[in-house]
């Protein structure tokens, strides 16, 4: 009898607990700003590559930030930014609506802006010019590689992220933007007004060259955009018709772009080999391989430098590790992390590091880069000089491609 009473009492207690606490949990209503914060938290919780979240209790971080009185959307964005900063991962970041749209546009094929490739120099934490695009307003304004962009329309670039800086330089065709530029060559600072124009993002430039009686096809890939593979195929077909039987693929100053574009372009050169391994948060490897016959098996040299990054390194690493090409130039940037884009309810977005990658020979190049087969140091040069007689790295590639011994080495490796 006592046992039955205890069981009945326990059931009553459980019922009271359910009645008291259940409705309270269901009654919690989050504001729109809290919902945005929660969605950002969930994306990281579900997809981030590091399950320790930089050795932190991610649930407690959620609770901490939910206690904030987030009254405006800007306050919500600031909270999300602070939350993501705790991961100590510069590639996992919030993209406000204009930044998110800008990032998607930059891989689509056309935009309106000043035509600068930019990056943040980690050594001095300053916005730095990789190169102005050929024929762009920035090039016409005299902006050069390695110039530092200190301010955009008076806004200090140290206080804004890379995407926001890019978004502020884009705008309606015919409008102007004021750039405060410091030249490391002369240590002078000047303010330049640049008129925005339509920037055609054709990611590929090609030409036929000749050395020692051999016809060499030169292909420069500036970015791994959605149309990059199609443009590479066009260039290869055109150069083959012109008689090219060996190639230089120029990946210098290519900051990367779409991972899938890098894999698809590697398949144009490889035959059944592994292109890249990705490693997720559980440590599970997934491989991407070439399928079918390559578009060409002609000898290939790839040019790389310190601004060759991300998807460019995937392609360069695949070609080098499989013995398909020799790399010439300087050690690459060393970005071996993969990000996915996630959209937030209000049109903002997030880039979240979801995996790391390794080359076919399982080299982890993050923060290490890829060392070329032949190191040729060279100061940064503009697009107009790339692939010219004064381009030392290009000339070294031509020498390799027109020497019988080097060609035999490349062909044997292939």
UniProtKB/Swiss-Prot annotation:
PROSITE patterns: PDZ
Compartments in which it is found: Cellular thylakoid lumen
Catalytic reaction list: The enzyme shows specific recognition of a C-terminal tripeptide, Xaa-Yaa-Zaa, in which Xaa is preferably Ala or Leu, Yaa is preferably Ala or Tyr, and Zaa is preferably Ala, but then cleaves at a variable distance from the C-terminus. A typical cleavage is -Ala-Ala-|-Arg-Ala-Ala-Lys-Glu-Asn-Tyr-Ala-Leu-Ala-Ala
Keywords: Hydrolase, Protease, Serine protease, Signal, Thylakoid
Signal as UniProt keyword: yes
GO biological process: proteolysis; signal transduction
EC number annotated for this UniProt entry: 3.4.21.102
CDD domains: cpPDZ_CPP-like (cd06782), Peptidase_S41_CPP (cd07560)
Role noted for this protein: Cleavage of the 16 C-terminal residues from the D1 precursor of photosystem II (PSII). This proteolytic processing is necessary to allow the light-driven assembly of the oxygen-evolving cluster (a tetranuclear manganese), which is responsible for photosynthetic water oxidation.
Protein name as annotated: Carboxyl-terminal-processing protease
The organism of origin for this protein: Picosynechococcus sp. (strain ATCC 27264 / PCC 7002 / PR-6) (Agmenellum quadruplicatum)
Recorded name of the encoding gene: ctpA
